[in-house]
């Protein structure tokens, strides 16, 4: 078997479709979840920690660098962080065989060469910390920023906004409902879309208001031992809790940890995105079914091909693509949320391994959001077919009739309607059948008139305002 060694990484050679075929649609997330992004976030945490240390009067060697100008120059190390800087850190790592130590050495070198800081000063980089103080702060920071800046805005823009527009546009259009795949009490097109809107909004509210973004910042085994022994007069717990808020107001430091964050809240966040995807899979399957029933038509896109052999095909590929990608995302969300909270004793390395894949399910989710958006943009409501289906299913008003008859004290109304409407084969209950049945009832004429006003088109119940 031949071995190819000269293949360069690009969109065609990438093993993952996220970095290959779909790169153009998901590259925005590389700012948060790529190797470059992780390194940059680590540098940011180290720098901001050093700046906060410099504000402590007890740390005499740092008093001289506690100036705004110094802080600006220090922040420029990560604010102006380039790919070449990340490459330099990776080069250092080849010697250290330790990614966080490589970040530490990179920053120290920058301080020496560009800021002319003494070695006494630079030794306060990574002071009292373990690697997981950096990772378990940098990664939650990348997650919260990606959720706030990309994932939730994309979900709202791609799906909630067009769904809400359609719901408003079609709020009064009656539609035959189907339970167990069979005709059921009518509803409206707009209300059925609002079901998904409400479900999604509930999950977004849960993400924004109820899922905390927690981090770990407490030294080798979570007790701030090195901090306490070196500067016992400082309240390091208060310092650490304030520090993580400097990075992002939503970050919250866990007080009781091992060497690593317990990830319970990361798991909660991943589970929330899994639920969002599950709701969207439900949406995709429903719209797919409505398209197959010709309740929706799809706008033709010039140049597109639906089948390599059947020229007539116009397939609901956007919803199918989204469903498939959300399945991949959910499998990864499930593994991450189940695995991350488990670590042997005070720490094993398994969390580090799987955390490197945390951007992958988010990428598949973003890809799905955009795919659904494309699919929604092609939808055209087929009102004629929807009306035709309603008119062919007059049996659905039997619920209304038997309920009014119950109100009037009519004997065995359910059984009477069941006898009329529960038919088999190709026989359909028509408007005429319903009218004839009503006329045969021994009830007052005004009740007969009330019953005759009920049709599959107006028997839609109470639709809340939206």
Curated annotation (Swiss-Prot):
Alphabetical list of SUPFAM superfamilies matching this protein: L-aspartase-like
E.C. number: 4.3.2.2
InterPro entries: Fumarase/histidase_N, Fumarate_lyase_CS, Fumarate_lyase_fam, Fumarate_lyase_N, L-Aspartase-like, Pur_lyase, PurB_bact, PurB_C
Keyword GTP-binding: no
Database matches in Pfam families: ASL_C (PF08328), Lyase_1 (PF00206)
Keyword set includes NADP: no
Domain of life per record: Eukaryota
Biological pathway: Purine metabolism; AMP biosynthesis via de novo pathway; AMP from IMP: step 2/2; Purine metabolism; IMP biosynthesis via de novo pathway; 5-amino-1-(5-phospho-D-ribosyl)imidazole-4-carboxamide from 5-amino-1-(5-phospho-D-ribosyl)imidazole-4-carboxylate: step 2/2
Reaction(s) catalysed (UniProt annotation): N(6)-(1,2-dicarboxyethyl)-AMP = fumarate + AMP; (2S)-2-[5-amino-1-(5-phospho-beta-D-ribosyl)imidazole-4-carboxamido]succinate = 5-amino-1-(5-phospho-beta-D-ribosyl)imidazole-4-carboxamide + fumarate
Single GO term (MF): (S)-2-(5-amino-1-(5-phospho-D-ribosyl)imidazole-4-carboxamido) succinate lyase (fumarate-forming) activity
Binding site residues for substrate: 21-22, 97-99, 130-131, 259, 347, 352, 356
Catalytic residue positions: 180 (proton donor/acceptor), 307 (proton donor/acceptor)
Record keywords, A-Z: Lyase, Purine biosynthesis
GO process terms (BP): 'de novo' AMP biosynthetic process; 'de novo' IMP biosynthetic process; purine nucleotide biosynthetic process
Subunit structure and binding partners: Homotetramer. Residues from neighboring subunits contribute catalytic and substrate-binding residues to each active site.
Homology family: Belongs to the lyase 1 family. Adenylosuccinate lyase subfamily.
Record-linked NCBIfam families: PRK09285.1 (NF006764), purB (TIGR00928)
Name of this protein: Adenylosuccinate lyase
């Amino acid at each position: 078997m031949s071995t190819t060694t000269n293949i360069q990484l690009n969109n065609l050679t990438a093993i993952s479709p996220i970095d290959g075929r779909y790169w153009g649609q998901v590259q925005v997330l590389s700012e948060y979840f790529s190797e470059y992004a992780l390194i940059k976030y680590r540098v940011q945490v180290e720098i901001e920690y050093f700046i906060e240390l410099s504000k402590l009067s007890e740390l005499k060697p740092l008093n001289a660098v506690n100036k705004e100008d110094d802080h600006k120059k220090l922040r420029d190390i990560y604010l102006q962080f380039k790919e070449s800087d990340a490459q330099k850190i990776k080069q250092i790592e080849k010697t250290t065989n330790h990614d966080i130590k490589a970040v530490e050495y990179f920053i120290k070198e920058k301080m020496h060469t560009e800021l002319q800081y003494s070695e006494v000063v630079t030794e306060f980089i990574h002071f009292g910390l373990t690697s997981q103080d950096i990772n378990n702060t940098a990664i939650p920071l990348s997650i919260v920023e990606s959720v706030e800046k990309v994932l939730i805005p994309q979900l709202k823009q791609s799906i909630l906004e067009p769904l809400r527009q359609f719901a408003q546009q079609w709020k009064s259009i009656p539609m035959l409902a189907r339970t167990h795949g069979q005709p059921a009490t009518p509803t409206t097109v707009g209300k059925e879309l609002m079901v998904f809107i409400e479900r999604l909004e509930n999950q977004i509210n849960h993400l924004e208001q109820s899922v905390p973004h927690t981090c770990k910042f407490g030294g080798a085994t979570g007790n701030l031992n090195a901090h306490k022994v070196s500067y016992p007069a400082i309240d390091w717990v208060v310092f650490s809790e304030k520090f993580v808020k400097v990075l992002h107001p939503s970050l919250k430091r866990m007080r009781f940890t091992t060497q690593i964050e317990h990830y319970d809240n990361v798991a909660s966040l991943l589970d929330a995105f899994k639920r969002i995807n599950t709701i969207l899979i439900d949406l995709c399957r429903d719209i797919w079914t409505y398209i197959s029933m010709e309740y929706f038509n799809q706008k033709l896109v010039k140049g597109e091909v639906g089948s390599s052999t059947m020229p007539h095909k116009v397939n609901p590929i956007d919803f199918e693509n989204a469903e498939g990608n959300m399945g991949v995302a959910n499998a990864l969300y499930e593994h991450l949320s189940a695995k991350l909270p488990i670590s042997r004793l005070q720490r094993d390395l398994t969390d580090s391994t799987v955390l490197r894949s945390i951007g992958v399910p988010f990428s598949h989710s973003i890809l799905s959001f955009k795919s659904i958006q494309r699919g929604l943009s092609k939808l055209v409501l087929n009102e004629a077919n929807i009306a035709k289906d309603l008119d062919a299913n007059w049996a659905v008003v039997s619920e209304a009739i038997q309920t009014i008859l119950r109100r009037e004290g009519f004997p065995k109304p359910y059984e009477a309607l069941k006898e009329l409407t529960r038919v088999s084969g190709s026989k359909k209950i028509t408007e005429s059948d319903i009218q004839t049945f009503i006329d045969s009832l021994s009830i007052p004429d005004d009740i007969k008139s009330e019953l005759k006003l009920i049709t599959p088109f107006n028997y839609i119940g109470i639709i809340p305002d939206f």
